[in-house]
A protein has these predicted regions:
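Catalytic grooves of carbohydrate-active enzymes
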Residues: 243-246, 257, 263, 394-406, ...
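Short glycine/proline/serine/threonine-rich loop/turn segments at secondary-structure transition edges
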Residues: 172-186
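C-terminal region of N-terminal signal peptides and the immediate post-cleavage residues
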Residues: 29-73, 77, 110, 411, ...
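Asparagine-centered strand-capping/turn motif at beta-strand->loop junctions
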Residues: 103-109, 667-669
Length: 669
């Protein structure tokens, strides 16, 4: 039965950025019951100002100022918008009630009165990822069942945003056939009379506990510089101050804290060096090897178990927290050193905190070192820049990131993989990550196969394009690309892995997800951690590390079970690759900076790390912003220009030359 089917394409409701009201709005908050029109006898709906922080409603007017928590529904001039902001639970089991909460924004010039809410749920589970995404993007419809309809009971004044909450009993949910476990679409519509004003869609995941082979999930996270980070480090008249770098250090440290089961952190050693990770900071953060492998050492090891990171080794030389987060546990001072003045909640050595985060990450999970400045291996190969590429690998091998324990075993392609690039990789790079969607399967399969294969002696990971987009907070279909809300991104990750698991429940497969370099800087680490947790803790998934993927690739070869994929092409040049002209311009800037600073006792104090302009121009992250790459080389000259502008010749006394030649003393300040 489908009593109501409302179809509206309100594209703005899918992209739901968090906004705060600048002007104060007032509203009366009340708890209202649904109208008798709903068959759900114990269903509840509440409507209250979005600014309220407690579930209890106040009858008096309250205001929503700019300093309050941001609301979710987007205020659009002349329109009414609705946003589903939370589900409780997000993964539902049989017999559970469902609570849907959200916000409604009145961007019109008149009060909204006589409003009603309608909630519909899909009758069956989506069977394909493409169908799931098209439905969520409101590009296609499906059979829906109305599970709630009721009046809101209050008006919403112009410029006001109000929250709503609807609780639907388990008996009203179309969740009967346990074989239909997995994602179900939810659609919430706000109407006035017969006119639908706006609607929003999200996903609920039904977990019946059905037996299925878990999907083994591996997620790759780039801990690399963004284009804006490289611009900060390289351009401008003055090098960035430590205050300028504070946010960048915090962001990188927060990414390192994501280390754990099923997560692979791919780190750029050049970025960590630019942020102050040195031999000294690594030595200070590395656990002391003093507990020797003798029976008497067991008690010391037991004491060291109190370190903040459960899977990391003890931290004997530092007692403060690893990042600018709340202070660490008391009494964790190590046996080999006394606390330094910086070991305080206001750690005055941010480079030490960042180094500690690196060391703890290496102990907690898979951390690999990328070539210096995350060099675009394919682009440099296509340009014949063998020396620059070799230098990138050499500098990584000599870096403190590798000294801390990160191997150089992984190469992460920024574009399509080709044979020329494979041949250019060093022997140490025995695992290759392709761009999402590269090397597609060329067999007719009814399920998504493991996203790991092999080419020659190398393990090749082929990340899932849909899941990789969702991890970055984007819904990409054949027709559109839309930013996802936090709820939708998390639910889409759960939903798509559930669909993939259901396709072949008797067959456990490996799922590889890669966060795009361009997305890494734009996703809050806390939000990213929640998405990783959703992938790790679903009953149909389990985390998996690099070692298991390598073993699976070897087993495929030995057993002849490797799925046939497209052959690796000989040569593929991407449109966004760095050009020979851009590298030439970068080299000209480097030479200019070198000539300007050659007379200075400490060039780095004057220009910072701008001398890395060539290496940074070759970074893979610039594929997302080729124009920015082209302008960086010219902008980097500002450092040299600032130096020459401060040079003056100091006046001296007259010198009479009697000989035909002489050495003249010149002092430059």
């Amino acid at each position: 039965m489908i009593p109501i089917k409302i179809r509206r394409h309100f594209r703005h409701s899918r992209a739901r950025p968090l906004i705060a009201l600048v002007t104060a709005v007032t509203a009366s908050a009340a708890l209202v019951s649904p109208s008798p029109s709903t068959s759900a006898t114990v269903t509840e709906v509440s409507l209250a100002p979005a600014a309220q922080t407690a579930p209890s409603a106040q009858p008096d007017a309250t205001s929503t100022a700019a300093g309050t928590a941001p609301t979710k529904a987007q205020m659009i001039d002349g329109e009414t918008t609705l946003s589903v902001d939370s589900l409780a639970p997000e993964i539902i089991t049989s017999g559970q009630d469902l609570t849907i909460s959200g916000t409604i924004a009145n961007g019109t010039g008149e009060p909204l009165e006589g409003l009603s809410l309608t909630v519909q749920m899909e009758d069956s589970t989506e069977m394909t990822v493409t169908g799931l995404e098209s439905w969520l993007a409101e590009e296609q419809d499906s059979a829906m069942r109305r599970i709630y309809q009721g009046d809101l009971g209050e008006s919403i004044t112009p410029g006001e945003i109000k929250t709503f909450s609807v609780t639907i009993p388990a008996s009203d949910l179309p969740l009967g056939d346990e074989e239909q476990w997995g994602p179900r679409g939810l659609e919430v519509t706000v109407s006035r009379g017969r006119a639908g004003l706006d609607q929003d869609r999200t996903l609920l995941v039904w977990d019946t506990g059905a037996k299925a082979g878990r999907s083994h999930v591996t997620t790759l996270i780039p801990v690399t510089a963004s284009t804006s980070d490289l611009t900060l480090l390289t351009t401008g008249a003055e090098p960035p101050t430590d205050a300028d770098l504070a946010d960048l250090r915090t962001r990188i440290a927060s990414l390192l804290e994501l280390a754990g089961d099923g997560v692979v952190l791919a780190v750029d050693p050049a970025l960590l060096e630019a942020l102050g990770v040195t031999r000294e900071t690594v030595a200070a953060a590395t656990p002391s090897p003093s507990p020797s492998p003798s029976p008497s050492a067991t008690s010391e090891e037991a004491d060291d178990e109190a370190a903040p990171t459960p899977t990391s080794p003890p931290e004997p030389t530092e007692t403060s927290s690893a990042s600018p987060s709340p202070t660490g546990p008391a009494g964790s001072a190590g046996p080999s050193a006394t606390a330094s003045p910086s070991d305080s909640p206001s750690d005055r050595r941010p480079n030490q905190a960042l180094t500690r985060a690196l060391v703890e990450a290496i102990a907690a999970g898979d951390v690999v070192a990328l070539p210096w400045t995350d060099a675009d291996v394919a682009a440099l190969t296509h340009l014949g820049e063998t020396d620059l590429l070799a230098d990138a690998y050499r500098r990584t091998e000599e870096s403190q990131t590798v000294a801390a324990g990160a191997p150089t075993s992984l190469a992460w392609m920024a574009g399509d993989l080709d044979s020329a690039t494979l041949d250019a990789l060093p022997d140490s790079a025995h695992t290759v990550v392709t761009a999402p969607g590269d090397l597609p399967v060329e067999e007719d399969l009814t399920y998504t196969p493991s996203q790991v294969t092999s080419v020659g002696s190398r393990t090749v990971l082929t990340p899932d394009a849909n899941l990789s987009d969702a991890l970055g907070g984007t819904l990409v279909t054949d027709e559109s690309s839309t930013d996802l809300s936090g709820l939708d991104a998390t639910q889409l990750l759960r939903a798509e892995t559930a669909v993939m698991t259901r396709q072949a429940p008797a067959l456990s497969r490996s799922v590889v997800i890669a966060l795009k370099r361009s997305d890494a800087a734009g996703v809050d680490a806390k939000t990213l951690a929640e998405r990783l947790k959703a992938l790790r803790e679903s009953s149909w998934t389990s985390p998996q590390g690099l070692g298991a993927l390598t073993a699976e690739a070897a087993a495929q070869q030995e057993e002849g079970t490797k799925v046939r994929r497209a052959d690796v092409p000989d040569w593929v040049v991407g449109d966004e690759e760095v050009s020979a002209g851009e590298l030439a311009a970068a080299r000209a800037t480097r030479d200019y900076l070198s000539s300007v600073t050659s007379i200075l006792p400490d060039p780095q104090a004057a220009i910072g790390t701008a001398s890395e302009i060539v290496e940074r121009t070759a970074s893979a992250v610039w594929r997302s912003d080729p124009p920015g790459r082209a302008s960086m080389a010219e902008s980097a000259r500002e450092r040299g220009t600032a130096v020459t502008g401060r040079l003056t010749a100091v006046p001296s006394r007259t010198i009479n030359l009697i000989a035909s030649e002489a050495n003249l003393p010149v002092r430059i300040t």
